[in-house]
């Protein structure tokens, strides 16, 4: 009733707010085997775009077509059950990524070895440090033989030795016919991994070209 609305209005104010679109009018095609760096400042829409590609979030309009097994190094510890052991979480996350238990069992030794968690793999993940969880998440994602690898600054996991190990592993994966989408703030890392570069600003792609051209554009405009 109007009386009730007036009464509620005495205690609760309606705060106007603006709607912000994280990604706007995007038209992008990435071919199989391409390695694409995505450059842009914080808030440019880079991570949102990757989350839409992986199905973590969905666009309010338009369509996304993904053809291949996607492994995403975005939020490395998402999908873990804190009460499960590390080994049990390997199977849990493997199933989430579309693998069956037989396939996961074949990959399990390599995952544990790469994560350097042999002594802790049968302990609950809630007892792990954040670094241990990230190492396990990274190891699962890079050892499932992905066809599409999506990386969002995930190579900063752990200490220097483990970061170097992660970088080497990603380069090794790229020797196969995989597609790479790589969000980074570092031109050096972008050049090391990618041949094509995209620059984003305010949710839009403002440049798309070779990696050298994209880095020059980003350095000049930002």
Residue spans for each PLM region:
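Pre-NBD coupling/linker segments of ABC/ABC-like ATPases
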Residues: 1-22, 212-221
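The feature captures the beta-strand-to-loop junction immediately N-terminal to the Walker
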Residues: 39-41
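A short, surface-exposed alpha-helical micro-motif characterized by mixed small hydrophobic
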Residues: 190-192
């Amino acid at each position: 009733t109007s009386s009730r609305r007036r009464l509620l209005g005495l205690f609760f104010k309606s705060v106007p707010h603006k709607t912000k679109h994280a990604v706007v009018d995007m038209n992008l095609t990435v071919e199989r085997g391409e390695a694409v760096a995505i450059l842009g400042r914080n808030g440019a829409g880079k991570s949102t775009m990757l989350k839409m590609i992986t199905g973590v979030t969905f666009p309010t309009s338009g369509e996304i077509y993904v053809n291949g097994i996607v492994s995403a190094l975005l939020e490395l510890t998402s999908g873990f059950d804190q009460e499960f052991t590390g080994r049990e979480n390997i199977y849990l996350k493997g199933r989430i990524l579309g693998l069956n238990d037989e396939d996961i069992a074949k990959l399990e030794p390599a995952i544990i070895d790469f994560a350097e968690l042999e002594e802790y793999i049968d302990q609950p993940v809630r007892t792990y440090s954040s670094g241990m969880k990230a190492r396990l998440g990274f190891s699962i994602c890079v050892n499932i033989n992905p066809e599409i690898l999506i990386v969002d600054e995930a190579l900063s996991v752990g200490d220097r030795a483990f970061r170097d190990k992660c970088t080497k592993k990603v380069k090794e994966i790229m020797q196969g016919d995989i597609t790479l989408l790589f969000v980074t703030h570092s031109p050096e890392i972008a050049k090391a991994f990618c041949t094509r570069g995209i620059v984003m600003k305010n949710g839009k792609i403002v440049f798309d070209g070779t990696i050298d051209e994209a880095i020059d554009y980003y350095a000049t405009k930002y």
